[in-house]
Regions:
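Short S/T/G/P-rich N-terminal loop/turn motif that feeds into the first structured element of a domain
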Residues: 1-124
Length: 124
């Protein structure tokens, strides 16, 4: 059995999406030690306005305790097809391309999980 516990600090407090759908993508990043996370977060928050032209972020967090050098964020989509379209459009965006050319160098690994809200969730 594998168990991971993290204490997260909100960089962008979570906002329940009003009309963007309830298919959520949770992305977790582990940065390289010795400043990689700060460099990645600085680059990511700088490009976020350009990325949000394609879809709005639900929240952005940095790990305070647990696994060091980690950040995570959540995006909402109306469907998996919409997610694929948004990601394809973002990949064509020059600002996002520039971020990827720099930002990926600060990371060791990334995990993506697609989530659906439980019936009792306020994130419906």
């Amino acid at each position: 059995m594998r168990q991971e516990v993290r204490l997260l600090n909100a960089i962008r407090p979570p906002v329940a999406p009003a009309s963007t759908g309830n298919i959520y993508e949770f992305r977790n990043y582990r940065a390289k030690p010795a400043g990689g996370l700060r460099q990645w977060l600085d680059a990511f928050t700088a490009v976020l306005p350009a990325r949000e032209k394609h879809s709005k972020i639900v929240g952005l967090w940095q790990t305070e305790a647990g696994q060091p050098n980690e950040a995570c964020h959540i995006w909402a989509y109306p469907s998996l097809d919409a997610r694929a379209e948004v990601r394809g459009n973002a990949m064509k965006d020059p600002a996002w391309q520039e971020f990827l050319s720099k930002g990926l160098g600060f990371l060791e690994e990334m995990h993506s999980t697609i989530m659906l809200p439980a019936p009792h969730s306020p994130m419906q």
